[in-house]
């Protein structure tokens, strides 16, 4: 646990950084929700998934990570829409309930998104601007892989007093590491992932295990992609590992549902 801007508590578990912990949870929560919703055989396992889901959701709130909050909102919106879209008819009541139960610090943090007078927001914007200036010269092949290469090139383009180990954006960091080809390769991998989960969704009925899990994977990946605009989501190897597990699971589920037979 750490303190942020006065008396605001931010949790980070074993990840040393609240944003990294939030990204980890952002990928786990949709899958946990799918396991909870599809568990029909054991009430104990269902209860376990339910408790895990509640604790994970609470932990995301206390990371105070605005990018992860936006990612979770996007992931939840996609999941709810395709799992049970009728829930949106009760949206006003849900919003009211959130206002009643959420701490004021959550709404204060959310309202600061895009506010350049906020220290954290301004810090990121200046890093992005410095990185973009750098990439004007290195967009074809990047500056090299890793923090070491970034740390050598970035200071020549950084704004005064704005030091950073990375670009605080997955997409800018990909171009920094390997240029436009790296960004294109990542885009192709992501599109392949969404192709897999789109195929698997609805196989065996929209409430089948494979369908719900494919929906959860797609929702989690979309939320993760949104968070990638605000931070470098592959900075921690554990988060990166879960991303590639997502990709592997999407391919495995498509194969098990018959999608690999004509490829």
Model-derived features: where do they sit?
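Membrane-interfacial, low-structure loops and terminal tails that flank and connect transmembrane helices
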Residues: 199-211
């Amino acid at each position: 646990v750490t303190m942020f801007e006065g008396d605001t508590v931010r949790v980070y578990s074993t990840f040393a950084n609240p944003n990294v912990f939030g990204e980890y949870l952002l990928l786990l929560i949709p899958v946990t929700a799918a396991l909870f919703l599809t568990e029909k055989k054991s009430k104990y396992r269902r209860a376990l998934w339910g408790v895990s889901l509640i604790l994970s959701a609470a932990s995301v709130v206390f990371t105070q990570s605005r990018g992860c909050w936006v990612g979770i909102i996007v992931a939840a919106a996609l999941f709810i829409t395709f799992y049970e879209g009728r829930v949106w008819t009760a949206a006003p009541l849900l919003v009211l309930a959130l206002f009643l139960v959420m701490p004021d610090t959550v709404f204060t943090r959310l309202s600061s998104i895009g506010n350049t007078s906020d220290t954290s927001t301004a810090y990121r914007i200046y890093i992005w601007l410095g990185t973009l200036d750098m990439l004007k010269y290195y967009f074809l092949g990047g500056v090299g892989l890793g923090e070491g290469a970034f740390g050598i090139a970035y200071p020549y383009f950084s704004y005064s007093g704005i030091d950073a180990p990375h670009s605080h954006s997955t997409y800018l960091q990909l171009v920094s590491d390997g240029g436009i080809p790296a960004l294109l390769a990542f885009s192709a991998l992501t599109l392949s992932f969404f192709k897999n989960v789109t195929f698997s969704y609805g196989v065996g009925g929209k409430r089948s295990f494979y369908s719900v899990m494919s929906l959860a994977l797609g929702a989690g990946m979309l939320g993760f992609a949104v968070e990638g605009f605000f931070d470098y989501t592959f900075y921690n190897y554990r988060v990166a590992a879960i991303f590639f597990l997502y990709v592997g699971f999407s391919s495995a589920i498509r194969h098990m549902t018959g999608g690999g037979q004509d490829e």
